Amino acid sequence: MKELTHIDPLIRQYDAVFCDVWGVVHDGVQVFESAVQALKKIRQMGKSVVLLTNSPRPKEDVVVQLQMMQVDTECYDEIVTSGDVTRDLICSVPRKVFFIGPQRDLVLLEGLSCELVEEGEASAIICSGFLEDLEAIPEAYEGMFRRLRERNLPFICANPDIIVHCGDQEIWCAGALARLYQQLGGEVRIAGKPHAPIYECAFKKLQKIRGIVDKNRVLAIGDGLLTDVKGAIRFGLDSLYIMGAFIIMIIVTMVL
């Protein structure tokens, strides 16, 4: 691993960047303007930028969120969300689903042939986050998950992140619930980072922008070792691990 203080010499080796959003572009409260300017500069160098986020919501919702936070649209070419690639997983499970997450995330199911049912009627579980009427800690779900596990219901996790920092606060994410369900012996299915589907989708979108691109010409940027870095290594990409500020980075050499 090599510590970097400037992105220019490194980025010249690549044709494109897959960049994380939460923790790199913003922290849920404030935008990291230095990161936005760096991404704009990367595009000005003739490179393509695809934002990869474990948000459980569709791309269109993330675009609106970034606009509301006044993130310059010139800092990216395309966006791929965990929510979008998770929809394919949802189509692979039985129709009757028990949804765990805030009401705003139900947009994840729009247009799909799902029937939302109560816990006792469900044939599968879709999780985007924590319920609004339960304490937002994983332990509060153990009893429910033991009941669901006894029925061998598959658990689809739309946001694999375990925890995120929202300003000065730490917030548990759906990945923490998926981890608990798996620890109880349940079957968990995930399409977001660090798993292949989100990278495969991003690569297809990148090739629509640039034509044929070699993986060794794509750099992944993120602040999550277990999501961004692990996913990049699995997919065969070089990665930059963000530590604090955008320009203080460590390069993680590609592992084949």
Annotate each PLM feature.
Residues M1-V21, H26-K47, L52-V80, D84-L256:
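Asp-based, Mg2+/Mn2+-dependent phosphohydrolase catalytic module
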